[in-house]
């Protein structure tokens, strides 16, 4: 059974790094960025089993189209594909996609219009005790519990959560086998939201988005931890562009208006031009209404090459890329042994932007500009006032005439 989709209408100032500048200069004009895009969300279901479905986000610009294909077949995964035509489409052949050899089961057509493509796969959810933890991102020293393989989760029908008004949908899942009952009242959710123009969400971390991006919020809610002060982590796999792994960068600023006390922005950049990217603040939250009081550090390990067959396989990644010779992975760890944690309210959320082209760059906020103006302007005004006072004083002395 096959489905074929026709075109539808529908934190602070950071200087540009040499890498970003080269991306800006070298990317084709059609993919340098669109101020607005016509965005559509469509659920593509297997007619033989409606519980098997894909979420296709199609963002059409003047001379380009961005395709985000989200899937819960196997581990949660997303394909990022950018084309240089506003008429590219997604083709899905369910019979091939679900077979042992899924080559050609998922394609973006015409294939020659593809300018960039890669994928992210969320493979495992880690849990470990935070006791005596020194470097959670690379080697947790506390007790490590058996990880949850996200390929062995059961997920909701994405159609039930599709919201065209907010251009969002949510994959919500729990382990198929849960002998400890940890997820009896809990779930792991992946909320996806697309954008037709630039802006900033109302809730922290308030990542600046553009029409070339979509946002993913990962939330662990209500699951019973296996330790008194458990920390959780997420394993993320991606495809390298060539023999190496994508690059990881840190941007720093003096502005924390949108995410208080967080002065860093982390980025993952793929190497091809135009590049795809991930962008996130190194912060997670232990309450649904994120605030400074519920902020937890988010640590990321370095990207390292890995063999694809050692990771849970995503059918859509296998179908689109055929061979996966250059896989890389890294871990994200949320929280620390002290401070806010998942144990507060059995809640954890983390947000990331995915996109193609040049990552959004924050300008200094009006508040910071005002503070800088006052800080720099006050001394100048004092000097000016002092100079005027001296001049007026000298003038008065020169006008004085002795009565003698």
From Swiss-Prot:
Glycans are attached at residues 63, 132, 157, 185, 228. Residues 392-404 are cytoplasmic. The keyword Transcription regulation does not apply. GO terms for biological process: positive regulation of transcription by RNA polymerase II; protein localization to lysosome; protein stabilization. Residues 1-26 form the signal peptide. Residues 27-370 are lumenal. It is found in: Lysosome membrane. PANTHER family: GLYCOSYLATED LYSOSOMAL MEMBRANE PROTEIN. This is Glycosylated lysosomal membrane protein. The lineage of its organism: Eukaryota, Metazoa, Chordata, Craniata, Vertebrata. The gene is GLMP.
